[in-house]
Amino acid sequence: MAILISGAHVVTGDAAGSVYDPGDILIEGDRIAWVGPASEAPATKPASGIEMIDARRRIALPGLVNAHMHSNESFEQGAYDNLPLELWLIHSYPPIDGQRLSEREHYLRTMVCAIESIRSGVTTVQDDLLVVGTEPEALDGAAKAYRDAGLRAVITVAMWDRPFLDCLPFLRELVPGDLAAELDRAPPPTAAEQVALFERHYRAWHGTAGRIGIIPAPSGPQRCSDDLLRGAVELSARYDLPVHTHVLETKTQAVTGQVFYGKTLVEHLDEVGMLTPRFTMNHAIWLTGRDIDLLAERGCSITHNPLSNLKLGSGVCPVRRLIDAGVNVALGTDGTATSDTADIIEAIRAGSLLHKIGTHDTSHWLGAEDVFRLATRGGARSTGLAGEIGAIEAGRKADVILLDADAWGFIPLNDPIRQLAFSITSEAVQTSIIDGRVVMRDRVIATLDEAAIKAEVAEAAERFRRERLPAMHAGARRVERYVRQVYERATAMDVPLAGEPQRRPPGFARPQRGRAQQEGRKP
């Protein structure tokens, strides 16, 4: 099947920044066959089997890439606030929790994010399915949801094999013996078991519909033995796959590297062989100058997640410094329990605004064009699809979105990328073509019965809220006081940051003391 998109304002997103207004895009099968000025379009006729899409008053963009998301959190939107990562984690992923969800529940949770992704212009998502070892029902449910929705998805098999008490510095010494024994009673699967489970998922789903990829994802170096990290590296090399890992999201994690290894977590990952061009580091906030140099030298990528970094108070990723060093940077929304959205346009807006604080030197700011690249070509490389997606160019996959130029945020049309970042909402996304297939037309998703899905999701999500969330919070409360002590102890310590000893990333201020305290007097 061929499609001709005619008369659009085409922003190709290619390296040259090509724009055609009006422009045409010819799609043949799952590939872009031609793009250029409408006046130079190949001669076509509707009778020749080509679907004609009249795209006058439409802005054509490359499909957006959400390079880091956790769809398994979608029933927890609005459940948390004012919690730093370490305390949020024990609520959303409680260490004392024997409950498992059905495959259908996993399917529905993923479908929530899939629908929101399509509606916000995402055509490719990297879903970090954060279920240890990724239980078969979890990955099967997620993969089926993406297959049915028509999205391109790179799904991770999450891995960690360290007991909960050994994933945070100082924690084991704080937790009383009876509680520690209970926490140690059900250890995670071994490194060998998790590698074997990855092989099962890879054989079952990788390459499905030409759109589904399966990749390894050690949850974080502090949660993984070196054997498991090396196992993930070996899987990545054997199958030529990306490997994604959460690293240095918080100050506590920066302290963890020093306590566990006597070096930064990035330096430790380099020692076990993980830093390669296939490696993506999620968050990357509490970096030293040496860390940045290592990431650049090894050809690594990072994902920037401004919404969750802000909500969790984690800090500000040094994106400009990373880009200037030659590190590839992609954009993500992160989980829907930390950013509370899978809407990539919200992340584009946050990323385009956040880096204008912290310095008056405008050369260090990020602009809308910078963040648009993160959400297109940057995401393509991070997901292992460089040259395949991320731009409207002949030979690339036919992932194209059409936005309504008559949306209020585009009137007048001064600069479509700046207005994408600062002016519009996802309601402006009208049509989505993924892998050469029209998945959404005039805001109606063609691949599924959205009303029926919404009704089923509402019932399942309400049951989760009523029955599951209270149990999760109860499990968290049993360890919260000890995790808070770890957090308070770690955040009071000095750690090196971007080559300088300081406590907080740019934009973080030290707590101010009153005059009496500064002078050593009682207030």
Question: Where are the regions a protein language model picked out?
Answer:
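Active-site microenvironment of metallo-dependent hydrolases
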Residues: 1-23, 27-28, 373-523
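Divalent metal-coordination and catalytic microenvironments
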Residues: 8, 25, 30, 57, ...
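Active-site gating loops and adjacent loop-to-helix segments of metal-dependent hydrolytic enzymes
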Residues: 75-106, 162-188, 251-276, 298-301, ...
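Metal-coordinating catalytic core of metallo-dependent amide/deamination hydrolases
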Residues: 137-284, 290, 511, 515
